Amino acid sequence: MTRLRANLLLVATAIIWGTTFVVQQAWLGTLGPIAFTAARFLLGALVVLPLALRQLRSVSRTIRPLQWNDWLLLLVTGCVLFTAALLQQVGILHTQVTNAGFLTALYVPLVPLIGLILLQHQVHWSTWPAALASLGGTYLLSGADALILGTGDLWVIASALFWAIHVLLVAYLAVRTHAPLVVAAAQFLTCGLLGLLASLLFEGPTPADFASAFHGILYAGILSVGIGFTLQVVGQRFTHPADAAIILSSETLFAAMAGFLFLGERLLQQQLIGAGLILAGTLGVQLVPLLFPPSPSPLSLSEPPRAIRAASSASQNSCRK
């Protein structure tokens, strides 16, 4: 798959995620947010599982079977996904939606920053201005009010860190395992089961609650999780995680468009400017590297840093003994 096609898959993911905000607002019913998260990820896992099992058998025959450390990383990725979603939801309960939307977008510059410092990822120079454009656009689109940090905001900032880690883990595992559908199904199942346990402990949902959100669960489970998150994993196998973060941030833009089309919401001038900045960042990270190709680098996404390669090799050798 070409980098352009991979990026288009990520744009499709952002469109699906953006429209899901409208669905959650209209069809959440009386179901608690943690239970809703659990239901949609478990449904998403069921959607992807048959294809994932088929891909797992194929990869085991043609490339290599997944080792115990692969499964451990998949489990960690699911835990990170659940933690990010939970921290974000807790933060939203104690802050304004405007603050939450902007602070969540902090994961956009965090992805290339963490990748550069900890994983030695080399990024094209255009990534940094594109990330700042997306972050600034999100701020304007969310209202550009004075941002006074409270307890809820700190929870959302923590969730942004975990969203950034999740993007990096997905990028690494999609290449490492050669099985993006397995990566998707494993993280969905882990996140869904953790969410189910948390909802039983803290929310106590009833069958009537699940029934009230039936249509929302169907849409979010099949489209947002089953298709959207899976497209993310497939797309990230062929593009840089920093580029993926910027493209996925256009979710905010598509959420605003969906609100305009389906809920009659109107955008102010500053919000339109913000939407333009997000669009510019999304297009820039795709087009600028084509006009100004990067110089060859000894490190690539498909070749992790030396320390990770050495640890992985030693672990796999120990499994063969």
Give, region by region, the residue ranges found by the protein language model:
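C-terminal-most transmembrane helix of multi-pass membrane proteins
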Residues: 41, 49-57, 213-215, 249-321
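Specific transmembrane alpha-helical segments of multi-pass solute transporters/efflux pumps
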Residues: 16, 20-21, 49-99, 103-104, ...
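Hydrophobic transmembrane alpha-helices of multi-pass small-molecule transport proteins
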Residues: 48, 75, 123-143, 160-163, ...
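Hydrophobic/aromatic residues within transmembrane alpha-helices
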Residues: 27, 36, 40, 91, ...
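Transmembrane alpha-helices of multi-pass small-molecule transport proteins
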Residues: 29-83, 110-114, 162-169, 184-202, ...
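Helix-helix packing/entry segments at the starts of transmembrane helices
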Residues: 37-39, 100-107, 170-192, 225-261
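Loop-to-transmembrane-helix transition segments
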Residues: 5-14, 60-87, 129, 151-159, ...
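Glycine-/small-residue-enriched transmembrane alpha-helix faces in small-molecule transporters
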Residues: 1-38, 79, 87, 145-175, ...
